[in-house]
């Protein structure tokens, strides 16, 4: 019997974990080990994947992977006897950073020079409050989300009040195994950059799972403190942790904190500075029983690889553990001789025979056994929190078998409706009136001052009309980001990945791929970067190539401008239709990519579903301000320069003479060279072609360019039909993304793939626009 056969609500004991490779190792690291109790919570609306409860936390995996895990006969967890461990409730006051010899290794401390910078790595599981702590420590305002893997790149900052420090916020990981790109980034930083100290943040509501990573970090021999985050939630729900006792068992300082409330931060910083300054390494790195087969195996291998580990820059204990697990990256860097490999293999096989487990399972079991002992003696588990109970009730509706998909469609439909037809549209109209009022005022002032006609035209027709036409759409963009931020911060984005995994798998993608693509509706740049959370290079590349097909917010001004001019009675419908066209084309391209560039199976789906929570007002406001500021910077930098340049090229010929007819201008000559390519699409006017070219710099420039070149919508309507306008919209939706997005693709995948994106999207856009023009002409 396997997990796949377990009904929802039933529990069983894991007997064997099948499979092989990095995925199996990842399962072991996540706690799916022999002897562990697993409970099936629910199946996704489409029947796949399945949500499990293991070691007091929730995990989702696919049925094809669940089929690899053999379990005992099912039972109801309520009927199983559970030992209720009670402990002394007297809690001693936690000592300060300079007190208590057992909390700091005084004997082996090795003080650094006073002028040496103290570098720290901030490491922890995904969604444990790491970025919140980073913001508190540094005073930064990095985006905080309620989705596993928000941090996809390292971020640096200086700890407030300590100018000679540098702390790096690393991507969230579950172990030091190289399963995903985030884990590789974090591991390489710790092993190669060698920070002076580690601040390991743990989710106190789930210490058991979080300590698995802590044990691997302690093997590195880097000075370390543990920040036990969310202790306020533990106390509220009746739980507690004997801090002094857990410090003795782990051999590193443990500080209870609440990053969200700023509690315990000063003490955490004091301990971190102290261990880094005096280079006090963890006092414990051996977590197996002295007489166990695993202990003999690891120490036997340590003696064999000592020289190789020193040469590769790896701590012996860490390297030995990874050799037993079969970590290919570590084995490659150790450069072992063939006879050494054979001796090591003999030692490991002997250990497997004595343990009755395979090598990777034995190491994972050793760690979890130690963790279980630590938690049994130091932790009183909190009762099920109100947040968890509330999340379960909400999930019955939002991830229910018959309600999950309809609710997703309804929620996204409501987001687009409110953005384009109610809130965003209303605010955009108000701002447009204000911009028009200011423009008319400046126009009258310049006229009264009898300013030179050329300069007058530049200021009004170029700058105010060009930049102002783009600024009026700022409310729509901010409104869209507001709703996307609410969905992410609340935890719903993770549910969307859970709901859509089976459907996306048919397209050759993982459910996690939907999150970068949903982010792409806001902006392609963070959407492309978010693909780093995917462990498979195949899935990652495919997701990066598909994300720009999702209509980013920078294209909203184009849709709104053309909809108001050509389809005033159906403006909202046309704008929403653009999003659906992008999705449909993305699906078609996914099928094509699956059969050509990206053959094979998508990455396995392994993810946590966080509790729902109320989005933090500060976080939402900060995100909106960042997006608005980014838009305004574009408006007054790229778009400002582009409008002046376009105005100049429209009003002067190649001899720099002022032209009476813009068809004789520099712009007309340049655009005229490629205009024939667009005539079959219904918009063969050089001014529209020019707008497309400027849109490569920033999509918002399309509207400002058209506003300058045509002067009025009446003129534009006279040279292009409604069918041509629809064709133009489809082309703008699908053609090459902006320079910033292309640069992000180049950064993630390299120049070759960035060139592919430009070429593929231009070809697809031309074909789609032609089909649109033909169909619209018939209708």
Predicted features and spans:
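Conserved G1/Walker A P-loop phosphate-binding module
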Residues: 94-175
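Conserved C-terminal guanine-recognition region of P-loop GTPase G domains, centered on the G4
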Residues: 162, 187-253, 558
């Amino acid at each position: 019997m396997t997990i796949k056969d377990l009904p929802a609500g039933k529990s069983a004991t894991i007997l064997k974990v099948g499979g092989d490779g990095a995925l199996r190792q990842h399962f072991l690291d996540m706690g799916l080990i022999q002897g562990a109790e697993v409970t099936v919570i629910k199946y996704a609306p489409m029947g796949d994947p399945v949500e499990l409860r293991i070691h007091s936390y929730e995990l989702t995996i696919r049925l094809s992977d669940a089929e690899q895990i053999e379990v005992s006969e099912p039972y109801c967890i309520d009927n199983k006897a559970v030992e209720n461990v009670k402990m002394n409730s007297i809690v001693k006051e936690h000592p300060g950073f300079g007190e208590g010899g057992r909390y700091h290794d005084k004997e082996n401390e090795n003080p650094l020079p006073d002028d040496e910078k103290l570098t720290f790595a901030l490491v922890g599981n995904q969604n444990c409050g790491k970025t919140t702590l980073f913001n508190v420590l540094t005073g930064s305002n990095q985006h905080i989300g309620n989705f596993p893997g928000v941090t996809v790149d390292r971020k640096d900052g200086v700890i407030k009040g300590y100018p000679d420090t540098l702390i790096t916020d690393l991507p969230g990981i579950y172990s030091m195994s190289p399963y995903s790109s985030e884990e590789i980034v974090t591991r390489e930083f710790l092993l190669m950059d060698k920070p002076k100290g580690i601040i390991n943040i743990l989710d106190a509501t789930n210490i058991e799972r979080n300590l698995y990573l802590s044990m691997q970090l302690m093997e590195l021999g880097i000075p370390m403190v543990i920040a036990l985050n969310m202790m306020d939630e533990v106390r509220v729900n009746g739980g507690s942790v004997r801090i002094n006792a857990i410090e003795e068992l782990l051999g590193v300082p443990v500080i209870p904190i609440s990053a969200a409330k700023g509690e315990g931060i000063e003490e955490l910083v004091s301990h971190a500075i102290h261990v880094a300054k005096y280079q006090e390494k963890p006092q414990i790195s051996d977590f197996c029983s002295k007489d166990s087969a695993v202990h003999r195996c690891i120490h036997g291998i340590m003696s064999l690889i000592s020289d190789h580990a020193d040469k590769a820059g790896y701590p012996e204990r860490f390297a030995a553990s990874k050799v037993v697990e079969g970590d290919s990256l570590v084995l490659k860097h150790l450069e072992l001789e063939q006879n050494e490999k054979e001796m090591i293999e003999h030692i490991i096989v002997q250990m497997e025979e004595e343990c009755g487990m395979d090598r990777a399972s034995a190491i994972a079991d050793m760690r979890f056994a130690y963790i279980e002992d630590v938690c049994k003696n130091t932790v009183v588990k909190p009762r099920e929190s109100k947040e968890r109970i509330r999340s379960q009730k909400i999930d019955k509706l939002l991830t229910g078998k018959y309600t999950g998909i309809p609710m997703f469609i309804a929620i996204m439909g409501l987001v687009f409706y409110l953005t384009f037809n109610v809130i965003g549209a209303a605010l955009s109209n108000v701002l447009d009136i204000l911009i028009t009022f200011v423009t008319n005022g400046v126009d009258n002032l310049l006229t009264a001052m009898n300013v030179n006609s050329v300069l007058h035209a530049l200021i009004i027709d170029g700058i105010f009309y060009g930049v102002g036409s783009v600024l009026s759409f700022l409310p729509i963009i901010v409104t869209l980001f507001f709703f996307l931020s609410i969905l992410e911060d609340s935890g719903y984005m993770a549910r969307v990945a859970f709901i859509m995994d089976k459907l996306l798998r048919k397209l050759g993608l993982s459910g996690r791929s939907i999150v970068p693509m949903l982010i792409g509706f806001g902006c392609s740049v963070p959407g492309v970067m978010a693909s780093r959370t995917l462990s498979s290079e195949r899935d990652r590349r495919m997701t990066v190539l598909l994300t720009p097909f999702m209509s980013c917010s920078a294209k909203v001004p184009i849709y709104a401008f053309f909809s108001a001019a050509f389809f005033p009675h159906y403006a909202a419908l046309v704008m929403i239709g653009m999003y659906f066209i992008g999705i449909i084309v993305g699906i078609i391209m996914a099928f094509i990519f699956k059969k050509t560039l990206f053959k094979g199976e998508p990455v396995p789906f392994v993810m946590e579903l966080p509790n729902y929570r109320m989005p933090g007002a500060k976080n939402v406001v900060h995100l909106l301000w960042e997006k608005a500021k980014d838009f305004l910077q574009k408006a007054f930098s790229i778009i400002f320069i582009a409008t002046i340049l376009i105005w100049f090229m429209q009003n002067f010929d190649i001899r720099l003479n002022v032209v009476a007819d813009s068809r004789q201008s520099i712009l007309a000559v340049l655009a005229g060279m490629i205009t024939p390519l667009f005539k079959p699409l219904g918009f063969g006017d050089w001014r529209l072609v020019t707008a497309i070219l400027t849109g490569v710099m920033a999509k918002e420039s399309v509207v400002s360019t058209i506003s300058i070149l045509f002067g009025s919508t009446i003129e534009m309507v006279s040279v292009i039909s409604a069918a041509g306008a629809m064709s133009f919209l489809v082309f703008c939706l699908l053609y090459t993304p902006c320079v910033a997005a292309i640069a992000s693709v180049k950064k993630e995948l390299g120049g070759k793939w960035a060139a592919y994106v430009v070429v593929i999207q231009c070809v697809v856009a031309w074909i789609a626009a032609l089909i649109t023009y033909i169909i619209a002409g018939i209708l």
